[in-house]
């Protein structure tokens, strides 16, 4: 039985996950309806930091009333009660649907039943999607860049087309009176907090970056175009996003981050095109995971929805990309089938192609598509990813590792050139810095990973802490975020070769890194290597981005030495341009 309690203007639903709704006046005649999901963990790849999330909706009241987006279905009762407490829904004149992803449009049909005379304002593609979601006829109007509506009392709302952020149907909406822009997923973050605005930059910056890397980075070119259009609107006081705190206190800093990160992506020497069908099966989540793995290696990615993109747009990206990732489309999608045919017509034998199933119930057979590419002489980026059940954490790990393998393949020659370009004397001098040999092991849910490490150094006495350098292109990176726990296994001099060999093996994506290795389980759930000299259970406290590595500061929570007289294995190098 679900019980509900009310305090002021916030409702609480006492279920397994804490769900609350808050209303806040953010500007004249403008109310934010923030649905707070305190315990949301990793269901999408972008929830990796596990700090919950919010679903933000907005009410603008002039002489007419506008509702900007709705919320997730899980908030149905709470959201609708809150909305009714703010306004008679029959008074709503317009519902702006920024895009049709279910966490923002999941309650559009419910609101339309309460506000039958409201007109839905959305992009052409969004309205096509909505017609499949809303079962009764509704009033609708297509909006695009430059279109405006005047709702009175000075509130004139101008629209900006922002396709592929991160869905193909996205629009922004700018209120000229309040200078508030409503951006849905863009400039958001998965961070749940009672503070409406971005008061504490340090608290949110890791989540802000993680969210960008997962959702916005794959569409850096589209984001730069959208930001250029934003610049033409005039002054922006508040970015009212769809997830997390609204941007106000640090708006300039955070938008500059988006600008610089996106410019870096757009200037990348190497690009992989990700071709999929939005909102079909698990294509969105799977392609995000593959894209995350690719981006770890410094390779840029660009995403295109095969069902909505123009043929020339598909061919333009395919023609300049070093690699192509293709999610199997439904056999019934004529547009997606045409998109696949257009890819086959421009693909080159020097490109690498990776295929994945979407578990949508009507996938095009992956072997049929695979054979067509092989017959053209195209090499496979990785074995086709076959999804035979609802994908879980292990499936997403498989996708991330496959993406990382492809990125490393595409950057191998570039990295070799960079290594050879270093000053010989300088690299020899740097190589005289020696370190111990360690193996980092970690497990989160059903996903486990490990890596050989040598760049480890004690950093504090109270508390006991050390730093460890983790390359950005390591598969373990997604399990080594601030707040994550792991085990640092110390290898023993004279007794480390077998473990070193095991954890240096290049395995197929998804393979069990611990196969044949004796382990025990630490208190924090991570594997302890039985044959290690010592181990420490650790927690990551902070992270510093340094070019091609992250420097993690970690504290020690527990530890033990198995051989008191043993010595730590040491890695001696002659040059400093590799491990």
Curated annotation (Swiss-Prot):
CDD domains: flavodiiron_proteins_MBL-fold. PROSITE patterns: FLAVODOXIN_LIKE. Fe cation 2 binds at residues 103, 185, 243. Residues 272-460 form the Flavodoxin-like domain. GO terms for molecular function: FMN binding; metal ion binding; oxidoreductase activity, acting on the CH-NH group of donors, NAD or NADP as acceptor. Coiled coil: none annotated. Binds 2 iron ions per subunit. In the N-terminal section; belongs to the zinc metallo-hydrolase group 3 family. Mediates electron transfer from NADH to oxygen, reducing it to water. This modular protein has 3 redox cofactors, in other organisms the same activity requires 2 or 3 proteins. This is Putative diflavin flavoprotein A 2. The gene is dfa2.
């Amino acid at each position: 039985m679900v019980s509900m309690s009310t305090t002021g203007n916030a409702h609480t639903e006492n279920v397994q996950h804490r769900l609350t709704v808050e209303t806040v006046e953010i500007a004249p005649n403008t109310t934010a309806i923030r649905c707070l999901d305190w315990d949301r963990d990793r269901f999408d790849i972008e929830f990796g930091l596990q700090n919950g999330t919010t679903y933000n909706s907005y009410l603008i009241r002039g002489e007419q009333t506008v509702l900007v987006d709705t919320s997730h279905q899980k908030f149905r009762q709470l959201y609708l009660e809150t909305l009714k407490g703010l306004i008679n829904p029959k008074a709503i004149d317009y519902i702006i649907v920024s895009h049709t992803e279910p966490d923002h449009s999941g309650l559009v049909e419910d609101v339309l039943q309460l506000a039958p005379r409201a007109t839905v304002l959305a992009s052409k593609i969004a309205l096509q999607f909505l017609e499949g979601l809303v079962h009764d006829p509704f009033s609708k109007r297509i909006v695009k860049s430059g279109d405006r509506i005047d709702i009175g009392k000075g509130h004139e709302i101008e629209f900006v087309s922002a396709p592929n952020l991160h869905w193909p149907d996205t629009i922004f909406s700018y209120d000229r009176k309040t200078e508030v822009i409503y951006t849905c997923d863009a400039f958001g973050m998965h961070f749940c907090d009672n503070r409406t605005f971005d008061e504490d930059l340090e608290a949110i910056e890791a989540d802000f970056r993680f969210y960008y890397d997962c959702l916005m980075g794959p569409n850096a070119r589209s984001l730069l175009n959208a930001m250029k259009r934003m610049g033409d609107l005039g002054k922006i006081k508040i970015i009212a996003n769809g997830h997390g705190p609204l941007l106000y206190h640090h708006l300039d800093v955070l938008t500059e981050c988006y600008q610089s990160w996106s410019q870096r992506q757009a200037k990348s020497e190497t690009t992989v095109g990700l071709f999929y069908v939005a909102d079909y099966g698990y294509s969105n989540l799977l392609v995000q995971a593959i894209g995350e793995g690719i981006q770890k290696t410094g390779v840029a990615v660009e995403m295109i929805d095969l069902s909505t993109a123009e043929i020339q747009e598909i061919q333009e990206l395919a023609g300049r990309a070093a690699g192509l990732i293709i999610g199997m489309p439904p056999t019934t999608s004529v547009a997606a089938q045409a998109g696949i045919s257009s890819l086959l017509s421009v693909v080159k034998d020097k490109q690498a192609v990776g295929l994945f199933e979407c578990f949508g119930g009507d996938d095009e057979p992956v072997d049929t598509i695979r054979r067509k590419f092989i017959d053209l002489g195209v090499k496979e980026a990785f074995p086709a990813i076959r999804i035979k059940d609802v994908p879980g954490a292990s499936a997403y790990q498989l996708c991330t590792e496959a993406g990382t393998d492809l990125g490393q393949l595409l950057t191998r020659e570039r990295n070799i050139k960079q290594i050879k370009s270093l000053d010989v004397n300088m690299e020899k001098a740097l190589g005289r810095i020696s370190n111990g040999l360690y193996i980092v092991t970690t497990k989160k849910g059903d996903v486990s990973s490990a890596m050989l490490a040598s760049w480890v150094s004690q950093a504090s006495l109270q508390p006991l802490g050390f730093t460890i350098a983790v390359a950005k292109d390591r598969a373990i990176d997604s399990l080594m975020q601030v707040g994550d726990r792991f085990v640092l296994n110390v290898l023993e001099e004279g007794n480390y070769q077998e473990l070193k060999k095991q954890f240096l093996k290049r395995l197929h994506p998804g393979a069990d890194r611990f196969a044949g290795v004796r382990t025990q389980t630490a208190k924090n759930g991570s594997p302890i290597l039985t044959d290690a000299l010592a181990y420490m259970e650790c927690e990551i406290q902070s992270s510093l981005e340094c070019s091609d590595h992250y420097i993690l500061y970690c504290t020690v929570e527990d530890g033990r030495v198995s051989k008191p007289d043993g010595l730590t294995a040491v890695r001696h190098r002659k040059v400093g341009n590799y491990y």
